[in-house]
């Protein structure tokens, strides 16, 4: 998974592929 905020956002959206 990504680190920091990206990881948390990934969990919230039900996806571990959130990259912004």
Swiss-Prot record:
One of its GO terms (biological process) is cell wall organization. Coiled coil: none annotated. It is an enzyme of class 3 (hydrolase). One of its GO terms (molecular function) is glucan endo-1,6-beta-glucosidase activity. It catalyses: Random hydrolysis of (1->6)-linkages in (1->6)-beta-D-glucans. The keyword Secreted applies. Optimum temperature is 50 degrees Celsius at pH 5.0. Stable when incubated for 30 minutes at up to 50 degrees Celsius, little activity at 75 degrees Celsius or above. Optimum pH is 6.5 at 40 degrees Celsius. Retains at least 80% of activity after incubation for 24 hours at 4 degrees Celsius between pH 4.5 and pH 9.5. The keyword Cell cycle does not apply. It is found in: Secreted, Extracellular space. Its EC number is 3.2.1.75. Keywords: Cell wall biogenesis/degradation, Glycosidase, Hydrolase, Secreted. GO terms for cellular component: extracellular region. Endo-1,6-beta-glucanase that has highest activity against the beta-1,6-glucan pustulan. Also active against the beta-1,6-glucan lutean. Lower activity against laminarin (beta-1,3-glucan with beta-1,6-branches). Little or no activity against gentiobiose, yeast glucan, lichenin, scleroglucan, curdlan, barley glucan, CM cellulose, HE cellulose, pachyman and pullulan. Belongs to the glycosyl hydrolase 5 (cellulase A) family. This is Endo-1,6-beta-glucanase. It comes from Acremonium sp.
């Amino acid at each position: 998974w990504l680190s920091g905020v990206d990881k948390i956002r990934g969990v919230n959206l039900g996806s571990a592929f959130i990259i912004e």
